Amino acid sequence: DRLLPAAIEAYEQSKLIGANAYFIKQDSLSSISDQAWKAAVTQAIENNTPEITFTNLAYSYASDDPVQVMMEAFTVVRDAAGQELPIGTFFSMAGEFGLVEQLDRTIVSKVLATMEQQKVSTPVTINLSMKSVASKDFRDWLRDRLQQFALPVELLAFSVTAYAAAKNQHTFGSFSLFVRELGATTLLKRYSSDVIPVEQIKGLHINYIRLARDLTTDIRQHNSKPDFLDIIQEVANLLEIKVLAESVSKEEDFDYVRGVGLFGISR
């Protein structure tokens, strides 16, 4: 059982290093017992200990003066000794213990409170698990929670990965419509057409798409990438969806996506 968190962590790290990379952590999280994982998750929920920061700042470059149009709520969780734990692994273990929906509620509430404290005026991406997206109890809770939110609800963009949404597009589309009724929005992150075909986007009823990083990396070195960016922007315009590019580091790639007219770019 302890191999699961170590395997998940290795996968997370390999994604950060590169597409064909592997990662071996000497001080492996596999040494953490199931009981310790459950205690860490339970502590986060019961004591409201997750820490929220805002990252992945995206700007519109439609004019000479960039305008911030989106940022992402990032969650930091720690064990009893104060050591930071990988959030992906943490959520996976919460799922193992049947606590992921409670964890989502805790984090959403913490994000909303942090936004209120900082008087945030830029839309914020809030990541959710599909377990919560599919839950009627979570939807009922979210409706009640948003009624207490002191800032405009349209600042909230609830997000899942394209991979997660692809497994149950109907459920995510239903959630998007529900969120729209509340006045908030939804965002599909790490999108690529091999995960969800472009022609299926309409049925998801989303407000934002954040492209997978690979699609905006070394764009001119792949004939398919410029074509895809043109197509996705055209489709997005027709469906009134705003497209974001994430972590565009190279100047030639930045110049290209800026020229395409994407809604927001983070660097």
Question: Residue spans of the language-model regions?
Answer:
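Structural preference for long, well-ordered alpha-helical segments in enzyme cores
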Residues: 3-10, 93-94, 107-111, 142, ...
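Catalytic core of bacterial c-di-GMP phosphodiesterases, primarily the EAL and HD-GYP domains
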Residues: 1, 97-172, 247
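Flexible, glycine/charge-rich interdomain/linker segments that couple
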Residues: 13-36, 53, 121-129
